[in-house]
Every structure is written in structure tokens, then in C-alpha cells.
Amino acid sequence: GLPQVPAAAHHQLAKDWLLRNGTSYHEDRELGTKRARAAILMELALPGSAYIYQGEELGLPEVADIPWDELEDPTAFNRVRDQIEKGRDGCRVPPPWKAGTPTFGFSPATKHEGAGVDASQAGDPCEKPHLPQPQWFADYAVDREDTDSGSMLNLYRKALGLRHEWMTADTTLTWLDCDRSSGKPDGAEGHTGGTIAFRRANGWASVTNFGAEPAELPAGDILLVSGPLTDDGRLPQDTTAWIALG
């Protein structure tokens, strides 16, 4: 199996928000979203349990610029060799439900009588969420993604529905003939590209293309793709397809 990734080194905090020369890191959200869509389909096709972290189902980026005086993660208040880290609060910001409300639907705009609120307080503004929500959260709100058939939220819904339908207790995984390395640095950030392609015991197959060249898909019925295929029906880079093999 794959080696364990040390959590302390790779999962606890955001990396590379400033380059070594102090300039701002270029965040390509369009490319990141494309890769995230491909990654979740590959993950959900694998045997075993799957975990979805808050906001992944919306394609919600981490909030990396929370003001220091509004952070809650103890990491932000600990100095190690004169270095300060913001911690993981950027992943804990209350998610957006409704685009047109003050707290994006996370909490009501005004207080209601009951549960510690007396009649004299009813109608007063509610407290702010425990972490600040940026205005761009409106673009990822559930009520907006709900009506967009191509949104990340609806991709998750389709994928989880198909996973429930196609998941088999047989955890056998067989590599397909199209599973191969490209043999050249045409993958993300100059890594070797290629295709990861496998099938489950019941004929459910997943193909993910990491290389620059579009990949041929095996014969069968396409169940779901993370993004558009090429005009001739091949799988572009950073895209996953689920197929019911013929």
C-alpha cells in the first residue's frame, strides 16, 4: 500500500502562501477545482471507507487570510524558533448555506425568544460566527450550487449516489491495461504523469489521467466524469471517468 503521510508535516496547516522572496503565492482555483473533482471520483471508487471534510463538497477553498486577532487555533499563539503559524482555522470557517444572508445561513440574522433569549432581546442582531466568513463565500453557497447541474455539490451527490449503487463487498481491485506511467514530467508541478485505471469486481472502473496527453477510455458505458471529455471522446489531463465496463 501507499506509505503513511506524516500528519504533523502535511495536514496540520496551509503551506506556501508566501514565496521565498516574500511575494504572494499564485492560487489557481480553477486548476485546483479541476484536480479536486478528479481526485474525489478516484477516491470514491476505491475499496473501503471515504472521508469528506467540511466544505469539500462545495469545492470551498481554505480561508488563508483570517486576521491574526480573530484566530482561535492555539497554534497561532505558540512561537517555535520565532516562527508563527496560523494553524487550521482556515478550514473551520462556518460553511455558506444561503448567499444572500448576513452569515450565509449559518445562523439567523436576529435573535428569537427562547433558549436563553428573553423577550427584550428578541429581534436584536445575532452574534457573528466564531470565525469570519469572506464575502466570496457567496459564490460557493449551497443554494447557488444546488441549482447548478455542473457544480461541485451536484458532482458529489451524483458520485455518492452511484457509489452506493455500484459499491460491492468484494474489495478486489484489478489494474486495467490502460494503467501506465507517461514516463515524462508532464504531470502536476513537473511530476511524472500517466493514467491510474482500475476496475472493481462488478465491472465498475475508474480512470484518472494525470498526463498531458488525452487518454483512451476502455469500452463501456460512461457513468460519470469529473469534467468534459475531448471532442473525440478521450480523457483530458486532471480528469476522472467512471465506466461500467462492457
Task: Enumerate the language-model features and the residues they cover.
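Active-site and adjacent substrate-binding regions of carbohydrate-active enzymes
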Residues: 1-220, 226-246
